[in-house]
Amino acid sequence: MAARDTQTFSARWDTDVLDRLKQRSEAAGTNKSRLAERYVDEGTRMDEHPGIVFRGGPTGRRAALAGGPDIWELMFTLKGGKARGEEAITATAELLNLTDSQVRTAVRYYGTFPDEIDRRIILNTLDADEAEAAWQREQAALG
């Protein structure tokens, strides 16, 4: 993984906020600075892209539609379809039981962070391929 450029940022924080940050960082097994950076990063992304939230899981945190699927899942579906342009928006919305507006929200987020979403698609595709191969080995072993 490439090193990231960083800068020091000094700020005065409310004591209660820092106490909660300390509790959350201990529970998450990370330091306060990293957790605060994550909160600021995700918070600014949510401000810039209303309707986007972040969820944790076994493969890490990922962007998702509020009340909907992960952005990588939506984009995987949209890119995998035959429709293009506005038809792709409508087809994806119908397939995932979303509104056209929700699909556009995801597409706008993807437009800003394509590498992040494409990496997630690749990671999950590899995981699915590995799971399929494991299942096939199990079936072969069972005769």
Where do the protein language model's features map onto the residues?
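Short, amphipathic alpha-helical "recognition" segments used to contact nucleic acids or chromatin
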Residues: 68-85
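Short, solvent-exposed alpha-helical "recognition" segments
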Residues: 42-49, 106-119
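Short, Lys/Arg-enriched anionic-surface-contact patches
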Residues: 2-4, 52-72
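Short Lys/Arg-enriched helix C-cap and helix-to-coil transition segments
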Residues: 49-55, 116-131
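Short Lys/Arg-rich basic patches
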Residues: 1-13
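Short, basic interhelical loop/turn and adjoining N-cap
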Residues: 30-31, 93-105
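Short amphipathic alpha-helical segments
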Residues: 11-13, 21, 28-41
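Short alpha-helical "recognition helix" segments of helix-turn-helix
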Residues: 21-24, 91-94
